[in-house]
A protein has these predicted regions:
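Short coil/loop residues immediately preceding or within conserved phosphate-binding loops
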Residues: 91-96, 129-130, 172
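Juxtamembrane extracytoplasmic/periplasmic/luminal helical "stalk" adjacent to the first N-terminal
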Residues: 1-5
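Extracytoplasmic/periplasmic ligand-binding sensor regions of membrane-associated signaling proteins
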Residues: 23-111
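Extracellular/periplasmic juxtamembrane segments that couple receptor/chemosensory ectodomains to their
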Residues: 106, 126, 138, 148-179
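Acidic surface patches and DE-rich sequence motifs
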Residues: 36, 101, 136-137, 177-179
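Well-ordered, non-membrane alpha-helical segments in soluble/globular domains
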Residues: 11-18, 58-61
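Solvent-exposed, extracytoplasmic
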Residues: 14-24, 103-150
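Non-catalytic interaction/Regulatory regions outside core domains
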Residues: 6-12, 97-99
Length: 179
């Protein structure tokens, strides 16, 4: 009854406060959310959603993939169609980490700031004409350290070089390739 509603509201406020505090202390996180249905989504902004965010997200490609495994963490690049479904005020992120909650119709979603990733990548100076890219294998999205790089399709993902690097036994290495 009324006590359960109060307890749920109290727990939601506690977790929203924790998310806000974490984000205030950690510039790497652009947004953190626990999505669920029945107005139970918890986000860093304290907004109560009047729709079933979890069900809506599971209806798109990203959400469907995450919903199929409670043991895996999934890494995605920025995705406009998923962002529209989530409608969580998502701005400038380049890496989304998503995980289904064990035995619950809920997911944790953390969006990592593009400026944080870009600054880390820029320290890996590839030299004149070179690129540094973060590639999310789950969806093939490429994020470049150089903001001016805009591509219609992937330059690296799916190429023979990419497959060789992904399946290689070495922990590190480099190779010059030309496009």
């Amino acid at each position: 009854g009324l006590m359960e509603v109060y307890d749920e509201s109290s727990v939601r406020k506690d977790y929203q406060s924790r998310l806000r505090n974490k984000m205030a202390l950690d510039s790497k996180i652009q947004g953190a959310y626990i999505i669920a249905d029945n107005k139970r989504t918890i986000d860093c902004q304290g907004i109560v959603r009047d729709r079933n965010v979890y069900t809506d997200y599971v209806g798109c490609g990203q959400g469907k993939l995450v919903s199929e495994s409670a043991t895996n963490w999934f890494f995605f690049g920025a995705d406009e169609s998923s962002d529209k479904v989530l409608d969580l005020g998502i701005d400038s992120y380049c890496l989304r980490i998503a995980k289904k909650m064990n035995n619950q119709p809920a997911m944790m979603i953390i969006n990592i700031s593009d400026s944080f990733i870009r600054s880390a990548m820029q320290s890996l100076d590839p030299g004149k004409g070179g690129y540094v890219a973060l590639i999310t294998d789950t969806d093939g999205k490429e994020f470049y350290s150089d903001e001016s790089v805009k591509t219609e399709k992937a330059l690296i993902y799916g190429t023979s070089f990419y497959k060789k690097a992904l399946n290689g036994k070495k922990d590190s290495g480099n190779q010059m390739i030309t496009f």
